[in-house]
Amino acid sequence: MNRLFIEPALGKGYPADESLKFLEKLQLQNKTWKYTDRLHFNFDFIGLQYYFPVVVKHNNYTPVVQATEVKAATRKVPYTAMGWEINADSFYRTIKKIWLYGGVKEIIITENGAAFKDELKNGVIDDAARIDYFKQHLQAVLKAKKEGVNIKGYFARTLMDNFEWSEGYRPRFGLVHVDAKTQLRTIKKSGYWWRDFLQ
């Protein structure tokens, strides 16, 4: 779905290939479709928020797109506490795809992170899975940079556990654990890892 926004914004028009065939019906219903040139903008940078890939399979019974998601657990691949697939190679391919559109001056990774079932034990949160996640995804960024992609920044999601719009306080993305009742902050091992990595 990213293509529906980024391609017109980069002056490529709306996608017209087989994978987005359902757009033909929308195109016929939308009289402004021919004015896609008005959507083109000369961006200073493209901000990329990446968490996980979505794998779908054909389904005639799903309206419009005729596809349904195949969850990571079903496919027996690594996933987070939210069921999101962990796939740094997909992150790398997404960065490259955006860069190869042409006309992109810079890419900034504005969000990248994962929620895991963090447990506070004896004042310590050993979130090794989050550290592995960041290592894998930073390797993807470095690989893309070495291949000429102009990546100017990377923002880890997030400093502290916070309120998620659709999930409340249950998912924990932070490098710092927050006890919602007492407001006590505890730096997770991933927080210390980032400190050491940046030094």
Residues covered by each model-derived region:
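Active-site region of glycoside hydrolase catalytic domains
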Residues: 1-199
